[in-house]
């Protein structure tokens, strides 16, 4: 059976960039990578209500710069910036270096794969039917500009005895195309029946190697490709064009004079 490769790892150095951007020697690499994982887990738990999509970690010259992409930046910042100051203090204590925190707003959370997966997992934990949650998320994404979306849920769906996998797709999701801008996100719903995993792929169009969108190809519109027919009143005899004598295709040609009887 063919297995699905991670869309982001497949496109690294082509159209996507790393989420952790720093250099380290062989001895320090493992500890710094484990530190990044702890930071992301802490932010995911701390900012659960802030709809956090991506977290980018950079380490310039014995410092750390963390960029948090959130659909609700006001929840992260808090009143008069109190929450972000406490968050910065916790991150400095966790990483042991001065930390700068930047908050970026996600303009269209309905087309962000990670936010879609988190939203579906929260609905499943509230006992909402998984098909309804998946189809509603797909409709919202397509309505707001996504060219394709695929959602997969695995586990004891609706509390059945045997776990199964169900998926829905709308539009195009070209996973083999390197220039395709595929956004990928995963989440888990902890229900009373067990854990349900959610995977989301969102296709947002093609990208060039520098991350820019290519110019639109000049494709003829559907109306231009389709030949236009003349109105029925403008045709001779008011019939439809076509081969003579065909059923419903206009008048027959004048037949040859019938042979006289008796021949």
From Swiss-Prot:
Limits of the KH type-2 domain: 39-107
Biased composition (Basic and acidic residues): 219-240
Name this polypeptide is given: Small ribosomal subunit protein uS3
Coiled-coil regions, chain positions: none
Biological role: Binds the lower part of the 30S subunit head. Binds mRNA in the 70S ribosome, positioning it for translation.
GO-annotated biological processes: translation
Family (UniProt): Belongs to the universal ribosomal protein uS3 family.
GO molecular function, one term: mRNA binding
GO CC annotation terms, alphabetical: cytosolic small ribosomal subunit
SMART domains, A to Z: KH
Pfam families, sorted: KH_2, Ribosomal_S3_C
Self-association and partners: Part of the 30S ribosomal subunit. Forms a tight complex with proteins S10 and S14.
Annotated source species: Bordetella petrii (strain ATCC BAA-461 / DSM 12804 / CCUG 43448)
Region of interest (Disordered), residue spans: 211-263
């Amino acid at each position: 059976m063919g297995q699905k490769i991670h869309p982001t790892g497949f496109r690294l150095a082509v159209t996507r960039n790393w989420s952790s951007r720093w250099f380290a020697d062989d001895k320090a690499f493992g500890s710094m990578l484990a530190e990044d994982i702890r930071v992301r887990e802490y932010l995911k738990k701390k900012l659960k209500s802030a709809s956090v999509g991506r977290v980018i970690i950079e380490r310039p010259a014995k410092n750390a710069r963390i960029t948090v992409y959130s659909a609700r930046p006001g929840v992260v910042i808090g009143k008069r910036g109190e929450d972000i100051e406490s968050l910065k203090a916790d991150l400095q204590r966790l990483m042991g270096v001065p930390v700068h925190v930047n908050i970026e707003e996600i303009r269209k959370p309905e087309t962000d794969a990670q936010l879609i997966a988190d939203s579906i997992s929260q609905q499943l934990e509230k006992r909402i039917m998984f098909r309804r949650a998946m189809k509603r998320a797909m409709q919202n994404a397509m309505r707001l500009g996504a060219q394709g979306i695929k959602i997969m849920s695995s586990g004891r769906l609706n509390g059945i005895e045997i776990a199964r996998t169900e998926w829905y797709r709308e539009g195009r999701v070209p996973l083999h195309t390197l220039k395709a801008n595929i956004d990928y996100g995963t989440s888990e719903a902890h229900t009373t029946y067990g854990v349900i995993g959610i995977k989301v792929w969102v296709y947002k169009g093609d990208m060039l190697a520098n991350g820019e969108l290519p110019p639109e190809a000049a494709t003829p519109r559907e109306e231009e490709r389709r030949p236009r027919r003349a109105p029925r009143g403008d045709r001779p005899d008011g019939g439809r064009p076509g081969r003579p004598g065909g059923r419903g295709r206009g008048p027959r040609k004048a037949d040859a004079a019938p042979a006289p009887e008796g021949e």
